[in-house]
Amino acid sequence: IFDPVGAGVSSLRNDMTKEIVENYPLALIRGNMSEIKAITKLIDLDTENDSVAKGVDVAASDVISKDNLDINGAIVKALAKELNTVVIASGPIDIISDGEVIFGLENGDEMMPLITGSGCMLTTIIGSYVGANDPLLGGITACALMTIAGENAAEYVRENDLGTGSFRT
């Protein structure tokens, strides 16, 4: 499982990301849409790609929405096909592809991106599920689990008038 944190931000991160995706077999790549687009640039994959990385957080123009779902889905699918792996772009709508099919999951809560490390938590859960399952099925299941847990945690926070530091289930 590879989480390309901050891909597209610095030459060090770009060089390491390129080396990993080109030289090591990966069961799955999970990143935000800016990180996924950065990988497509690094390997010269021909996609419509206007992303500008801005650190470890997704660029505002790369936040996955219904308006850009088709183009972002095509990018995720093309990268998965090119690298022969499962690719997950996480966001308000998670896009998951093995290069043949594309799935979109629209669960979660707008509070989730405010929790530092939520993407890393998702990658850890994905690792648990992919270790025991097909990478595509494991990735879908892990994303569903994380986003539904996020909905439950957000409900708890709102019902108890708490802040994001109490975001848990």
Residue ranges and their predicted role:
Residues I1-P4:
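Short beta-strand elements of ligand-binding domains
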Residues G6-S10, I95, M112:
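Short, small-residue-enriched loops and turns at beta-alpha junctions
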Residues S11-I102:
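Conserved phosphate/ATP/ADP-binding segment of small-molecule kinases
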Residues S11-N14, M33, L69-G73, C120, ...:
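Electropositive phosphate-/nucleotide-binding environments in soluble metabolic enzymes
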Residues M33-E35, I93, D109, C143-T147:
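Glycine-rich beta-alpha junction loops
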Residues A38, T116-L145:
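Short, small-residue alpha-helix embedded
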Residues L105-T116:
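Short pre-catalytic strand/loop immediately N-terminal to key active-site residues, enriched for Gly-Thr
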Residues I148-T169:
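Charged C-terminal helix
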